[in-house]
Amino acid sequence: MAGSGVAKQIFALDFEIFGRVQGVFFRKHTSHEAKRLGVRGWCMNTRDGTVKGQLEAPMMNLMEMKHWLENNRIPNAKVSKAEFSQIQEIEDYTFTSFDIKH
């Protein structure tokens, strides 16, 4: 029976990471981790020296990525603060992969 699988609930949140997160390959590592976890969305450097972005994934994957953003072990990076929007359920993905915006 085709299509008999249960659809996964998808959730989304926005993030902004503060600290020493530019010039230390933070976006590259974030993209790699998101792809490893099956998280879709994007990240980019801001003019204020932060990295911000959006995440979309099933809840467990989203929470793993959120934890990674707060506690990563990227050489030379130092997160001083991580801000996240409220998690919202969405009907379907709006991104097809995880991208680094320039």
UniProtKB/Swiss-Prot annotation:
InterPro entries: Acylphosphatase, Acylphosphatase-like_dom, Acylphosphatase-like_dom_sf, Acylphosphatase_CS
Catalysis performed (reactions): an acyl phosphate + H2O = a carboxylate + phosphate + H(+)
Active-site residues (renumbered): 27, 45
Acylphosphatase-like domain segment(s): 12-102
Any one GO MF annotation of this record: hydrolase activity
Listed EC numbers: 3.6.1.7
GO cellular component terms, A-Z: cytoplasm
Gene3D superfamilies (UniProt xref): 3.30.70.100
pH-activity dependence text: Optimum pH is 4.8-5.8.
Signal sequence segment: none
Keywords assigned by UniProt, alphabetized: Hydrolase
Keyword rRNA-binding listed: no
Domain of life where this protein originates: Eukaryota
Family: Belongs to the acylphosphatase family.
Name of the protein: Acylphosphatase-2
